[in-house]
Amino acid sequence: MNRLLSVFALGGAVLLAGCVAPTPKPNDPYYAPVLPRTPLPAAANNGSIYQAGFEQNLYSDRKAFRVGDIITITLNERTSASKNAGSQIAKTSKTDIGLTSLFGSTPNTNNPFGGGDLSLEAGYSGDRATKGDSKATQGNTLTGSITVTVAEVLPNGIIAVRGEKWLTLNTGEELVRIAGMVRADDIATDNTVPSTRVADARITYSGTGSFADASQPGWLDRFFISPLWPF
């Protein structure tokens, strides 16, 4: 019996270990800076003020429109959610069966073992009730800034950006990652854009080290709060 319990405990630990989110690592190729696909033309020294290949509209600002350009995203994320749910189910059933004859004849109800006469009557009654309540509240706030690079410019002018920032502290590392789509019109003259203007945003804030480990429950605690716990 003890051996069987040990096997179940080991199997549960393995399953819970597989459910743990992987630890983020730096230098992810997906978030690496994207370099321009074509090099800029070399400046020709021909004595002229205007050079071919270098132009800037006098009535437009110099914004990041090309692959490899840099954009600063201002993080100002605030989300809150709450949910209440309740359910109550009750059922009462009662059945009475009274028989005076069986197949057209009255059976002998004398008790051969003594005592009172036997009876063909039967009855059943039962009550069942289920009640449950749940409540969940969650809120998140993320402020700051992160500078990313232009990864792709779509034919309709939408700009795909992504990048990451790692902060190495004495107790671990802090990570901020973001990827999404930005309209060129939403980019300010200083090449900044608020995170609320980033479409299909994928924002990650995580970390490693003792502080991050302290906020994570142990494998046995995860078992008791997981759907595998039968009670």
UniProtKB/Swiss-Prot annotation:
Pfam families tied to this protein: FlgH (PF02107)
Membrane topology recorded in Swiss-Prot or TrEMBL: Lipid-anchor
Cellular compartments annotated: Cell outer membrane; Bacterial flagellum basal body
Domain of life: Bacteria
Lipid linkage positions (N-palmitoyl cysteine): C19
GO cellular component, one term: cell outer membrane
UniProt signal peptide: 1-18
One example GO MF annotation: cytoskeletal motor activity
One biological process term in Gene Ontology: bacterial-type flagellum-dependent cell motility
Functional summary from the UniProt entry: Assembles around the rod to form the L-ring and probably protects the motor/basal body from shearing forces during rotation.
Complex and partners: The basal body constitutes a major portion of the flagellar organelle and consists of four rings (L,P,S, and M) mounted on a central rod.
Protein family membership: Belongs to the FlgH family.
Protein name: Flagellar L-ring protein
Organism expressing this protein natively: Pseudomonas putida (strain ATCC 47054 / DSM 6125 / CFBP 8728 / NCIMB 11950 / KT2440)
Protein's gene: flgH
